[in-house]
Regions:
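Repeated scaffold domains used in trafficking and secretory/extracellular systems
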Residues: 68-70, 113-118, 155-163, 204-211, ...
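Conserved blade-ending motifs and adjacent loop-strand segments that build the rim/top face
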Residues: 242-254, 311-334
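Asp-box/WD-like beta-propeller blade repeats and closely related beta-sheet repeat scaffolds
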Residues: 132-179, 196-201
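Blade/loop signatures of beta-propeller domains
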Residues: 28-59
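Short beta-strand elements that form the blades of beta-propeller/WD-repeat-like
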Residues: 35, 78-83, 125-131, 167-175, ...
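Blade-loop segments of beta-propeller domains
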Residues: 59-63, 97-124, 131
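C-terminal motif of bacterial Sec signal peptides marking the signal peptidase cleavage site
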Residues: 22-23
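Beta-strand-rich domains and repeat architectures in extracellular enzymes and scaffolds
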Residues: 54-87, 282-285
Length: 382
């Protein structure tokens, strides 16, 4: 079975001497600051937040095997899983039945060299896949190839995309010393960039799952090592809100770093600094819906989940519930959070023994092996 903990650590702990986006002008402040006492973590009942949970084993066969889950999208009764390691998108129905796999590697128009991101184009009702080498491939919702777009160079690579409208595509490039800009807007009609924005400065950088989020047609941007959440407006990043974790809050711009291009210095940095009092957490996942602001902090040996009720201002901080149920989030919308099981962080057994749980295809649960596909959990909000 997929080792999600090791996968996460490899992703989030990747540190290099690249860059972090500059903060907006010092004169600009966030519209709101949410102060959270991380020491106030409580083992609340999972039923206080969620009306029910669904356990969905993903079908395992020769074609559907998943190596890593890098992104999940749920759309129109389909579940789309990006697996960067095997350069594939796997499509399942809402009950975990395997539908199809996109895995056409090559240089032809209907092929890709790598896969870095996927999104749903709601204007055309299609799936868009990003080859970081400069190509966007369009597929039907069932995975049939339709067309390709070739992107300009520079930059050397692209890492995330979002469909702004029928014509415009927002593209994000991980900062490096060779890049001027992090964000670009590409016009399909003009076949070129119509805007480039946000410069950077050298510092360390890590990866937050789904750094680009959409809520009510607004686009938000999150970084693993920053509590500041930005809203993308036209060709500008504006502070939207920020998390304040009190004594645990840190500021990379005020830290001194060794030469992280040196392997020995990297190893030392991992051992002595990451998940220590200097950098006690990374922002692993951040999102929102009509009711909640939500984030997950990845700390040493645990995930700390934070829910902030926009209306009541109530704050919930928990690692595991009273029922010993954890939450490893990969997707969130107005109705639910989708996560996965994990041997250490979110074991399956407490889920099976709790109330308000629905197990899809229960017979599969009893035949799982180390080679079985991951198990998804839908946490349905009250």
């Amino acid at each position: 079975m997929l080792n999600t903990k090791n996968k996460f650590m490899k992703t989030i702990l990747f540190i290099s001497t690249i860059t972090l986006l500059l903060s907006c002008s010092n004169s600009q402040n966030s519209n709101s600051t949410i102060s959270i006492d991380l020491d106030a973590s409580k083992s609340i009942s999972i039923n206080n937040i969620f009306s029910k949970m669904e356990i969905i084993p993903l079908e395992t066969n020769e074609k559907s095997i998943i190596q890593n889950i890098d992104k999940i999208i749920e759309y129109q009764s389909f579940i789309y899983i990006l697996d960067r390691r095997q350069k594939a998108v796997l499509i399942f129905d809402s009950h975990g039945k395997f539908i199809s796999k996109i895995n056409t590697i090559g240089r032809a128009p209907d092929e890709f060299y790598l896969l870095e991101d996927i999104v749903i184009n709601r204007f055309a009702n299609t799936l868009e896949c990003l080859d970081p080498m400069g190509k966007i491939l369009t597929y039907s919702l069932q995975g049939q190839y339709q067309s390709s777009i070739y992107l300009p160079h520079p930059p050397m690579a692209y890492h995330y995309l979002h469909i702004l409208n029928q014509d415009s595509i927002l593209l994000y490039t991980n900062p490096t010393k060779y890049n001027d800009y992090t964000f670009r807007i590409f016009s399909r009609q003009q076949d070129t960039f119509v805007s480039q924005f946000m410069k950077q400065k050298k510092i360390i950088n890590g990866e937050c799952r789904q750094p680009i989020q959409v809520y009510k047609d607004s686009i938000y941007f999150t970084q693993a090592f920053s509590n500041e959440i930005y809203k993308i407006s036209n060709d500008t990043l504006l502070p939207a809100y920020q998390w304040d974790f009190g004594k645990y809050t840190y500021n990379l711009s005020k830290m001194k770093f060794p030469d992280l291009t040196n392997p020995e210095e990297q190893i030392k940095f991992y051992k002595e600094v990451m998940y220590s009092s200097k950098i006690p957490y990374t922002l692993g996942f951040n999102s929102q819906n009509d009711r909640y602001l939500f984030c997950s902090l990845f700390m040493k040996n645990k995930i700390l989940n934070i829910l902030y009720d926009k209306t009541t201002k109530r704050k919930v901080v928990f690692s595991k519930s009273k029922e010993d149920i954890g939450l490893y989030p990969l997707y969130m919308d107005n109705n639910k959070i989708i996560g996965i099981t994990d041997e250490t962080l979110v074991p399956l057994e407490p889920l099976e023994n709790t109330q308000n749980i629905e197990i899809i295809k229960k017979e599969i649960i009893y035949t799982l092996t180390d080679y079985s596909n991951p198990i998804l959990i839908k946490y349905i909000f009250k």
